[in-house]
């Protein structure tokens, strides 16, 4: 039960942080590229790499690890929004943005996890 509560708290915190960061990015100006979701997902990949490495290394309680990874990172990042925005780019005929977004998100996401692990080791 404690794990569920901590995951819940982490998820809510991650969702609020995602909203605040996304709004902050979109206030910078309009573009055809979904920079807010892109930035959130890449940052979330870096964070999950950091959290997994640090919690393994310093032997943090598994409940805290779940709160940070499944809760915070799960609430912060968003695959469903990424998928929806990708489809909208495709439907709008914005093919360069569509391919850049998909390839960039996947490649930079993987590199972000690697960076997070490297930074934490």
UniProtKB/Swiss-Prot annotation:
GO terms for molecular function: fluoride channel activity; metal ion binding. One of its GO terms (cellular component) is plasma membrane. Na(+) is not transported, but it plays an essential structural role and its presence is essential for fluoride channel function. GO terms for biological process: cellular detoxification of fluoride. The keyword Cytoplasm does not apply. Keywords: Cell inner membrane, Cell membrane, Ion channel, Ion transport, Membrane, Metal-binding, Sodium, Transmembrane, Transmembrane helix, Transport. It catalyses: fluoride(in) = fluoride(out). Its main location: membrane. Na(+) binds at residues 74, 77. It is found in: Cell inner membrane. NCBIfam families: crcB. Belongs to the fluoride channel Fluc/FEX (TC 1.A.43) family. This is Fluoride-specific ion channel FluC. It comes from Phocaeicola vulgatus (strain ATCC 8482 / DSM 1447 / JCM 5826 / CCUG 4940 / NBRC 14291 / NCTC 11154).
